[in-house]
Amino acid sequence: MHTKFFLTRGIVWIAVISLLLSACAAAAPKTVATEVREEVVKTVEVYEVEAPAAVQQDRPAYEPTAAPAPSTNQFEDYGVNPYTAAVEDHLSTFALDVDTASYSVMRRYLEDGSLPPAESVRVEEYVNYFDQGYPTPPEVAFGIYADGAPSPFDHDGTHLLRIGIQGYEIPEWERKPAVLTFVIDVSGSMDRENRLGLVKRSLEMLVERLTAKDTVSIVVYGSNARTVLEPTPGNEHYQIQAVIDSLHPEDATNAEAGLRLGYQLAMQAFQPGYSNRVILCSDGVANVGNTGPDAILEQVRGYVSEGIYLTTVGFGMGNFNDVLMERLANDGNGNYAYVDTLDEAEKLFVEDLTSTLQVIARDAKVQVDFNPEVVARYRLIGYENRAVADQDFRNDAVDAGELGAGHSATAIYAVQFNPDAEGRIATIQLRWEDPDTYEVHEINGNFNTWDLDSSFETTDPRYQLAILAAYYAEVLRQSPWAADVTLDELYSLAKPLLHSLPEDEAVAEFVQLVGRAARIAH
């Protein structure tokens, strides 16, 4: 049973807050009152969410796999967040992240017959890979949603909270014109596994979606960098694709020179009010010039501040540099994806094209203010390398995350309560900068003990998916907080999702991947 609160209206109408409390398919979301702040939206709406109908599906089949050859892939271990006593630190602050590369990297490892390295796993990228089913906020920028239930893995009263941010959607035909600069790695390493061939086919999918209002330029780099296509109208598909088709692998890898020239070309073609973006396609290998992310970023930082965004797209495995690609995206005001199949390329460049190209929020960050009278301790599962100092939540000079149109971002918290405590669990606050007006907005809302579900089994299937994805990542990265959770247990819990979310191909693949990981682990 969910309690309704009175609507609180503020002075400036900017956005909507709603906390989605899905106890079961029939449960109605709660209306939430928000604290009045001068720059904050103060209106509340109620949304209805229905669970998909169940259908019968067979268990997915798995093929025997062989162990892969040793590799020189580069990943970084960011550690695992500990529990924090709410009485000692009641604030949890992090930059939003919509990257999904870590999940795709895992899939590639499983296809090659081995579990992914623990350091390659970033929990939030597993969770954010999936559609969370949040309602799109009507005629406003963002909605905040939350739900929670007892953990299916712990029997000590631990509850798992899902906190979601959903941005407004823009139809593809209404998106801003895009000024795109492709920076393509044509070094010798891109000849392996036909990496360059996958780059070509991926970019061709993107080019087919462009129109006369868009502009495309292309820079390639091996030992040196050069421009192979000057700014060209996006509807010149044949000309653009002919240049892409003509590319072939060359020698060493000077990523610094490629990005520097790419940004220079992007700046020359820059159009105020357009989506100005550099798209880097590479395996991340850099062995000529400056090779580290800090040194490379130093060469292009000025262009980033001018409003040129960066998308890094990783290809290949065996000598893949995940560290470089992620750091470039994080510090380049962008996003990071890994393409291992044409299906993944279609997801990035066709299905999510507007989300990929058009930014609706800059420096977006979340602060969760836990109530020490109710919460004994809490743990943010993931976002280890996206932490923001609590005192910097309202410091708008601190870099945070960018969200594209229709993007959502989700965080999972493990929470333990004080005995018999009831009331407000936390206040969830979102702060972001409008990329067009540069105005800073902030919205917030409360989540309470009476909003919790009584059991994991009766929660919304999308909540269950988010929790299972998070714990799948926890097991793969060997988190001490999931030491007693097995892949077999996760597979058993995941199988019902085939019936509750029958139309979602990503869910079916997830169940299959969990089963495959369990087989490999035996």
Predicted regions span which residues?
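Intrinsically disordered, low-complexity Ser/Thr/Pro-rich tracts
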Residues: 1-70
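Residues that line or immediately flank small-molecule/substrate-binding pockets and catalytic motifs
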Residues: 23, 98, 282
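Exposed acidic/Ser/Thr-rich ligand/metal-binding surfaces
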Residues: 28, 143-364, 418-422, 435-437, ...
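An acidic, Ser/Thr-enriched
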Residues: 62-109, 114-120, 138-143, 153-161, ...
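Extracytoplasmic
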Residues: 115-132
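Short, well-ordered alpha-helical segments
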Residues: 124, 197-200, 466
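Generic structural signal of hydrophobic/aromatic residues within well-ordered alpha-helices
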Residues: 126, 130, 240-244, 349, ...
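Periplasmic polypeptide-binding modules associated with outer-membrane biogenesis and secretion
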Residues: 128-133, 145-149
